[in-house]
């Protein structure tokens, strides 16, 4: 091989190996190295088409249905923002659907259905629960209640809250609860409390507590959340440390007079509640081993009666971060491709003539009187006008 071509070709091969090797490694961590099948699914609803990434553990099916968790993202994000929860829950045996909300990611609402802030999120999670409840790999109890958890971040958290409320309203008519547990990340009741403007019931902590239906519920409220969990009477502003569990909203939610963070409480309806308060900001919930551990611990407690269908792995043992690192390495390899690839392409007959030698400097003629006249006009004209 021509020595002039050898080095670019070598670097091209190295870059390709990095891309392929680390992409394979990232895919391995995403699927727990073949123990979980990951596929994109689509399903129609009355409002449009929802899509998500389905994480189906090996062996899950009609003969071995599993506790299920539907996770979703915040405003202007997509299902991939829930990779950490989806990977860790699925490798412990849960079926997981990482959902794109309406008009986000691969999901789309029918024309005229959304179009406003209160259009895309209030029912997205509950519509996904309707679909998942009908699937043979999703566990139900002897009475037909779904063993399904709902978890979302920010707007996804608000959607999870409304899903629980709507499920309890439907229970009054059907006698079936499809949602068994719910954990919200980075959301309080700021927006669900305004659902009255959208013709729905406004949901605050008291309404949530009254409609919990004995479910296991939790909240993850970062101590430095930029948007939510303000103290009573406080308004938004610069980032400040917050103690949500001390607010009247949290007390109503936990149904306790002096609750503590990270503590389980039994409720009069037979349910359980907890509020986690990690030392984080709002978006850190997406990329946190601490937040992920809280999620795993929550569902371990929520689904403890169905532990036989799950795999016991300590919540501190997480692999999702290795997937992120592998993807970053693959991205570096992708960037490395460009220089050797361009160098080799320039050797092709079609592009060889595009290479030029050193250009001679341009000869500039001496400025004439016209140049000075135009310069003077350009300076004076703005002042005159």
Language-model segments: which ranges?
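Core alpha-helical transmembrane segments of integral membrane proteins
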Residues: 317-385
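An N-terminal hydrophobic leader/cap segment in hydrolases
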Residues: 2-44, 51-53
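Soluble extramembrane regions of membrane proteins in the secretory/endomembrane system
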Residues: 30-319
């Amino acid at each position: 091989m021509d020595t002039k071509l050898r080095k670019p070709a070598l670097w091209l091969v190295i870059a390709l190996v990095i891309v392929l090797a680390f992409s394979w490694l990232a895919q391995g961590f995403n699927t727990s190295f073949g123990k979980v099948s990951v596929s994109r699914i689509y399903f129609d609803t009355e409002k449009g088409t929802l899509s998500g990434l389905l994480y189906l553990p090996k062996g899950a099916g009609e003969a071995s249905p599993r506790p299920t968790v539907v996770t979703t993202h915040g405003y202007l994000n997509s299902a991939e923002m829930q990779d950490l929860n989806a990977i860790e829950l699925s490798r412990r045996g849960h079926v997981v659907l990482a959902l794109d909300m309406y008009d986000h990611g691969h999901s789309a609402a029918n024309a005229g259905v959304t179009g406003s802030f209160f259009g895309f999120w209030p029912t997205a999670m509950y519509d996904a629960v309707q679909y998942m409840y009908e699937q043979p790999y999703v566990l139900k109890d002897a009475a037909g209640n779904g063993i399904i958890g709902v978890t979302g971040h920010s707007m996804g958290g608000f959607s999870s809250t409304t899903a629980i409320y709507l499920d309890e309203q439907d229970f009054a008519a059907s006698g079936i609860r499809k949602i068994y547990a719910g954990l919200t990340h980075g959301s309080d009741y700021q927006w669900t409390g305004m659902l009255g403007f959208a013709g729905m019931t406004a949901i605050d902590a008291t309404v949530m507590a009254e409609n919990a239906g004995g479910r296991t519920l939790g909240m993850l409220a970062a101590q430095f959340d930029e948007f939510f969990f303000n103290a009573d009477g406080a308004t938004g502003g610069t980032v400040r440390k917050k103690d949500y569990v001390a607010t009247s909203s949290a007390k109503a939610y936990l149904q306790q007079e002096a609750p503590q963070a990270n503590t389980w409480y039994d409720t009069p309806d037979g349910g359980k509640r907890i509020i986690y308060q990690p030392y984080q900001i709002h978006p850190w919930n997406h990329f946190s081993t601490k937040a992920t551990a809280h999620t795993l611990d929550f569902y371990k407690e929520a689904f403890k009666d169905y532990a036989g269908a799950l795999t016991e792995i300590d919540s501190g043992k997480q692999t999702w971060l290795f997937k992120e690192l592998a993807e970053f390495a693959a991205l570096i390899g992708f960037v490395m491709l460009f220089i050797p690839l361009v160098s080799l392409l320039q050797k092709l007959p079609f592009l060889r003539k595009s290479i030029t030698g050193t250009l001679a400097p341009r000869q500039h003629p001496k400025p004439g009187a016209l140049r000075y006249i135009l310069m003077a006009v350009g300076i004076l004209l703005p002042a005159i006008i």
